[in-house]
Swiss-Prot record:
Organism: Emericella nidulans (strain FGSC A4 / ATCC 38163 / CBS 112.46 / NRRL 194 / M139) (Aspergillus nidulans)
Binding site for Cu cation 4: H508, C586, H591
Protein name: Laccase-1
CDD domains registered for this protein in UniProt: CuRO_1_Abr2_like, CuRO_2_Abr2_like, CuRO_3_Abr2_like
Claim: Repeat is one of the keywords in the record: yes
Amino acid sequence: MYLSTVLFPLLALNLGLSHARFVRETLELTWEYGSPNGGTPREMVFTNGEYPGPDLIFDEDDDVEVLVINNLPFNTTVHWHGLEMRETPEADGVPGLTQTPIEPGATFTYRFRAYPAGTFWYHSHYKGLMQDGQVGAMYIRRKPDALRPYAVITEDPRELAEIQYAEDNPYLMLATDWTYLTSAEYHNIEVESGYNVFCVDSLLINGRGSVYCPGYQYLEEVSDDGLTAVLEGTHLTEKGCLQPDLHNVQGDYGPWNLSAVPTEVVFNCTPSSVEPPVIYVDPEFNGWVSLNFIGGAAQKAITFSVDNHPMWVYEVDGQFVEPREVEMVGVYSGARYAVMIKLDQTPGDYAIRIAVNGGDQVMSVYAILSYVNQDWIHRENVPKAAIGPHTDTVGYMNYGGGNTSADVRQLLFTENLPAFGVPPPPPSSEVSTTLRTGMIRVNNSYSWSLGNNVLYEPEMTSSTPLLFEPDPLAVIAPKYALTTENNTWVDIVLEITADPRDLIHPPHPIHKHGNRAYIIGNGVGKFRWENVSAAEAEVPDLFYVNETAALRDTFVTDFFDSRLMDGAWIVIRYFVQDKFPSILHCHIASHQMGGMALALLDGVDVWDS
């Protein structure tokens, strides 16, 4: 059985209007019982009575006004993930930086320009409410005359028109994760046990996902070979999770209290079932479809594929890229990947597979791509979607997120496709400032620092948002902030610091608010140079300050093992274009709750203006 509601493409065509519209939306937040995965209901956030919140669709440069009504029993905010907010920094939605929290029973109106165009999402930026369901997808259609990258896909005029129609009318695929615990309960288990907890009950796609319990033996059979490196001779739990007391995963920060971790959190698996979302497509109407995946999970990264359908990745983090044809794509929390798919298969149903990517749990969730014109195919020949465990011989990807053949092409989460249609980054000689981070655990297994060994909480300045302070460093200690001057190019070295107590770091998806940044280099070992100019002179092959640079707002570090390396780093480069109280943080919810963030105060030399 599939969902009875047909999920038609987003209904507003790009009419080619050159003037900006004024668009008004209302989001009412409520705290009610729900069960997106068919398991035990728990209290969660609904937006306008829905989970996830409604898709918000705008045209580039629309003037947007969103009234948020907070009927939750908690403070909250809304962050518009990926939007620049250059003209309206007060709308960025970070408590303590751009606003005071929206208190229970209160309202707040966000006003901003819908810019840049592309795939985005919105979510709470207050404590762990994103994990409780305060999320929704957002899409901004490009102007009709925007330069597009599709010539590498096809030169056929009809196909190019169909591709642009698909771009303007995508299916937004919001991937999240779910646990029967509220975010506050989840975090309290970390505090009481001392463990870094990252196990979930299920993945969800557009708010739906079943719980499968195929047994740990099967889960280990389909898991990535790299998982062996962290299991320390143990087995996965029935839930597909790592044992909670693995020394190389938790670091040397004991003692821990295993009794404070309920068995349902990590060990027990209780199956449940909901109908998968169905994406209906009609190749006779339009021969291409765009699926725009949003990494909205609190704890998990994902890999996705569509059975029998190669995909052209054409947009990452809202930015057009040089298209690449693949069968599997890895996505970390905060990132967005749009793929263009040609509808040229036998009419039928095909599984859209979404699996955990990251080596910390083995599980999958499914949606279905359904051709509407199946009637003329003999019933026995109509393809049926193979979903659930033990369907690994079908499609490109197995239940554990691994490929089913060496011929399967995969875009890894560490690969960054070159940006399309934008100038390359400037040479390193034009950079005015080089800033450094130092990612490391502090004091225990669940507290993470982005730099200076500090644990940052945006709420610590909730009553005095830094945007409205003439001297922000008089309100927040300098160790909690990185500062820049206006109209300058800045490099930030995102570096993992090796520590003998802190053996393994998972990949960290570091998200930057405000404008995007170029990824200009990465490497293993310590970043031992004063700046990129010095590093380029010694190891030029590690840098790409040219047209191959990616332009993103989420930057994912590679898997780190201090037993094999003494550091790892990524360098990003961006232009400071105005006063902006930005933030740089890991988008894994438990890491951010554990302190992994720094204020990024741009343009402090013009702050009092």
